[in-house]
């Protein structure tokens, strides 16, 4: 991720709900890859190690689900999630996804961007 290149660690607690879903999927995918690697290398897991992996997976899911904002964001329809992300980009970062550009100020964004939705840019 871009933040990691700058030396900033992005944790589930600090991430926007949109990124929490992505980060959660990555953690679970990494855990699954680790399980598959052990399975294919024919290294048998002891009951203790298997239990630790199950506990880790449960902890990852529990951590994500304990955040009310994340749970609320994930419960939205995809179109509503997109609206949240588009507004966040505009309000916090002065960026329009459809223009593909960063603006110098809120006034610059209002003057030069036709709107928040894709239809506004046609």
From Swiss-Prot:
Any one GO molecular function term: RNA binding
InterPro entries tied to this protein: DUF4187 (IPR025239), GPATCH11 (IPR039249)
Gene Ontology annotations for the cellular component aspect, listed alphabetically: nucleus
Protein name, as recorded: Uncharacterized protein C6F6.19
Originating species: Schizosaccharomyces pombe (strain 972 / ATCC 24843)
């Amino acid at each position: 991720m871009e933040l990691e290149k700058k030396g900033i660690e992005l944790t589930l607690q600090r991430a926007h709900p949109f990124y929490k879903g992505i980060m959660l999927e990555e953690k679970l995918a990494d855990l699954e890859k680790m399980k598959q690697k052990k399975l294919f290398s024919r290294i048998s897991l002891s009951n203790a190690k298997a239990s630790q992996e199950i506990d880790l997976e449960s902890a990852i899911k529990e951590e994500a689900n304990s955040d009310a904002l994340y749970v609320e964001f994930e419960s939205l329809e995809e179109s509503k999630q997109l609206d949240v992300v588009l507004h966040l980009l505009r309000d916090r970062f002065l960026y329009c996804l459809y223009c593909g550009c960063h603006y110098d100020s809120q006034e610059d964004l209002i003057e030069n961007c036709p709107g928040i939705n894709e239809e506004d840019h046609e």
